[in-house]
Amino acid sequence: MINNVVLVGRMTRDAELRYTPSNVAVATFTLAVNRTFKSQNGEREADFINVVMWRQQAENLANWAKKGSLIGVTGRIQTRSYDNQQGQRVYVTEVVAENFQMLESRSVREGHTGGAYSAPTANYSAPTNSVPDFSRNENPFGATNPLDISDDDLPF
């Protein structure tokens, strides 16, 4: 069976970092993930997915990723249930994340649009063709000579 999840979205709040009685770090947060299609109003909807992360990755996430951070998460879906204080069974579906990746630069995360440092622009000209040329020969075998094989040489 395969249970793999890959999500890219923005954190809706700072991760809540807690520790178990055996001193294992656990972080919980919600990730807003845009849907690939738009609603009838032309607006893009989002799913809000609960995520749990454990151990060192949880501490790293709590230290680096903040509300609004664009992150990528890999992990698995997990369901669990518990009885609440009213005695009702509550079912929870969440992503147990194994890894995360920050997907924006630090300056974008911190909201710097200007800043004290400005790159020098005098005497700078952008290359005219900055897009790599990935074009290929239409016929990769066009430059070769045909093989001279008789029907008697073929095994079938």
UniProtKB/Swiss-Prot annotation:
GO cellular component terms, semicolon-separated: nucleoid
Limits of the SSB domain: 1-104
PROSITE patterns the record matches: SSB (PS50935)
Motif mapping: Important for interaction with partner proteins: 151-156
Region annotated Disordered, chain positions: 111-156
InterPro entries: NA-bd_OB-fold, Primosome_PriB/ssb, ssDNA-bd
Any single GO BP term: DNA recombination
Keywords for the protein's UniProt record, in alphabetical order: DNA damage, DNA recombination, DNA repair, DNA replication, DNA-binding
Biased composition regions of type Polar residues, renumbered to the chain: 120-132
Pfam families assigned: SSB
GO MF annotation list: enzyme activator activity; single-stranded DNA binding
Purpose: Plays an important role in DNA replication, recombination and repair. Binds to ssDNA and to an array of partner proteins to recruit them to their sites of action during DNA metabolism.
Subunit description: Homotetramer.
Protein name: Single-stranded DNA-binding protein
Organism from which the protein derives: Streptococcus pneumoniae (strain ATCC BAA-255 / R6)
Gene name as annotated: ssb
